[in-house]
Amino acid sequence: MQFPESWLRSFVNPPIATAELSHRLTMAGLEVEEVDPVAPPFSQIVVGHVVEVNKHPDADRLNVCKVDAGTGELLQIVCGAPNVSVGIKVPCALVGAELPPGDDGKPFKIKIGKLRGVESYGMLCSARELKLSEEHGGLLILPEDTPVGADIRKVLDLDDQIFIIKLTPNKADCLSIHGVAREVSALTGAPITLPTMAPVAVTLSDKLPVKVEAPDLCGRFAGRIIRGVNARAKTPAWMVSRIERAGMRSVSALVDISNYVMLELGRPSHVFDLDKIHGGLTVRWGKPGEQLKLLNGDTVTVDDKVGVISDEQAIESLAGIMGGDKTAVTLDTQNIYVEAAFWWPAAIQGRARRYNFSTDAGHRFERGVDYATIVEHIERISALILDICGGQAGPIDDQIVNCPKREPVRMRVARAARVLGIPLSHEVVSDVFKRLGLTFSVDGDVFVVEPPSYRFDIEIEEDLIEEVARIYGFEQIPAKPPVAENAMRPTNEARRTMHDVRHAVAARDYHEVVNFAFVETEWEADFAGNTQPIPLLNPIASQYSVMRSTLIGGLLDKVRYNLNRKASRVRLFEVGRVFRRDAEVADGGLSVAGYAQPMRVGGIAYGPAAEEQWGVPARAVDFFDVKGDVESLLWPLQARFERAEHSALHPGRAARVVLDGRAVGWIGELHPRWLQKYELPTAPVVWELDLDAITAVGLPAYREVPRVPAVTRDIALVVRQDVGVQDLVDAFEKAAAGMPWQRYLQGVVLFDEFRPKAATAAIGAQEKSLAFRITLQDTDSTLQDDLVEAATQQLIRAAGDAFGARLRA
């Protein structure tokens, strides 16, 4: 927003300098980006009255003028401007004057000179020569009542400053001189003076029929007829100056008045040519296919999401954005209809951008404009029109349809003090609210504030706390380093955190990655067997169109990324959410009805099992390497690995991970068909686990340090080739349950497997030999041989009963 300081000071004039005013506005949240002078420095330029104009005797394009510059004698000045004439008043640079610097950056000093033999004692100036504008078609002609000899800087108020303020979207109440003046008054305590908005004399009874059909578009609509205006009337110089210094251009008196009041009071309005309106006006949503030629010359096609104002024949305006060309006022307009309304912000937001333009009116309405002062502002517009353009005014037709109902906002003083980090008393808060003009009551420690009709940014407690901070002064809040006053909490030894899991995986030589939760539809089908993934309504890219239900796709993609960059060994892991449909999930603080969002941890290993080292034979990572990583991650939990099939994994080299009878994840080699599809030279091994299932590890159980060595027995069992090792281990655990020696059993571990190429006397063609090491230990005394033997035999019998196992001869 841009405005001249003099205009602001006509509303509120605190006894502070420009720099201090700029600083206070900035510290209150109205960031002053620039403060620029209206005109560059120059001196000895006064108002001159051209008394006589004669042709130059030796130049067709030059004139010899006699000018009264208030010096007591007429000055002879040679001038080449085409618009010089007797009787005009123009800026006159006296001998010794310094004009603004030119392109070379040096000031231009006026001296007595000769032009084609005629002496010139000064210079008549254009606006461009004074750096007031780019207009260079002739001299800058001043009003007739301008005093001769007066300093041009004072006459044109050229010592004024232009403020350029960068407003945040919530400060729509400051998109006017009145709004900024309210802030200055609150910050400095200076009284505010408003322009008169007394009702004008109503001399007509005419009303234009208006029907509001869309209360969700327009909450209040008001307007009046004014007849007999002179649209060719000249806009007063003071108004033109203020409009131009606010960054707008002067168009015509009627348009200038509408723009002036918008800048002054923040009230966008529209002036229709009454004689071009057919019948009455209707405020409604557009109909698909309707077209409108706008004031900017563009023709737009509307639909039922765009608000319009129409007459009986066609639409005449885009509601709250821009008027139509058909009913625009011209210099021949005699009768007008002045309209002002409250448009709901949600009904205006984004509409102008659909047509690739923006307007000052739309910028204000989409943020919220005061709905309570519409009539007063129409009176202000009417008074200016009658004063400048003449005419007769009819009554204001004010229709209140659906204005916002503002709920009181409560602010706890104690909470405000805690948020701001400063002590706050009731007196301080009360003073701030009074300076802001907020109506409030006090209920104990709580201030109950009625939000003003022009403050759409006050809705919750934090908004009021912000107001207290702004007016109290951010610079008065002491700068202190943040102090985290954390109470010591006991560590839950029965659970480990997500960070513990991440550190544990990283310790196994995996590197963490963070992938998008948005994946390709194809990945879901390939790696999760999910043919109905959760789609995204507005994906950031076509390949990220669905939510992932597995981490495998992203991990595999990053392996390919690294392989394309000549990496030979890649070990990655990720901890993140996956998404799946679940009708049992209800809405909650962090949940969405119908969708489960569990946390998973997954990893992938590709290439050599270990980094290249001269003393270690090179070999590719396999299922059992990664199984060891998973077992290490799960420790002290003991998991079962059950053979199973998964759409992403090799059918013979995949296992389901089971904890306490519950499936918590998968591990396996990537399926051969995906190796070819995704162009991988060799198969990586992948794994994925439910994070919640592996964080509960239970309390550690402490045991006495053994005083005697452990006893081991090795047994080799011959079983059918389809018998799984895990099944045998389960049989051993079942046999040990309840036995006297169970407490001594430390473990049964497979240490060898043998499959003969051909049948032998000891092992058949469809059999294999599995060698287990049984470890027993008592912490106090050496175990007796008979107990060890009994335990060993019982385990052998259990394997024989369950799977027909026999000792290998």
From Swiss-Prot:
Domain FDX-ACB intervals: 706-808
Chain residues that bind Mg(2+): 457, 463, 466-467
EC number assigned by the record: 6.1.1.20
Reaction it catalyzes: tRNA(Phe) + L-phenylalanine + ATP = L-phenylalanyl-tRNA(Phe) + AMP + diphosphate + H(+)
GO terms assigned for molecular function: ATP binding; magnesium ion binding; phenylalanine-tRNA ligase activity; tRNA binding
Ranges for domain tRNA-binding: 39-153
Key words, A-Z: Aminoacyl-tRNA synthetase, ATP-binding, Cytoplasm, Ligase, Magnesium, Metal-binding, Nucleotide-binding, Protein biosynthesis, RNA-binding, tRNA-binding
B5 domain: residues covered: 404-479
GO CC, any one term: phenylalanine-tRNA ligase complex
InterPro entries listed in its UniProt record: aa-tRNA-synth_II/BPL/LPL, B3/B4_tRNA-bd, DNA-bd_dom_put_sf, Fdx_antiC-bd, Fdx_antiC-bd_sf, NA-bd_OB-fold, Phe-tRNA-ligase_IIc_bsu, Phe-tRNA-ligase_IIc_bsu_bact
Biological process, per Gene Ontology: phenylalanyl-tRNA aminoacylation
Requisite cofactors: Mg(2+)
Subunit: Tetramer of two alpha and two beta subunits.
HAMAP family noted in UniProt: Phe_tRNA_synth_beta1
Protein family: Belongs to the phenylalanyl-tRNA synthetase beta subunit family. Type 1 subfamily.
NCBIfam families per record: pheT_bact (TIGR00472), YtpR (NF045760)
The protein's name: Phenylalanine--tRNA ligase beta subunit
Species: Ralstonia nicotianae (strain ATCC BAA-1114 / GMI1000)
Encoding gene per record: pheT
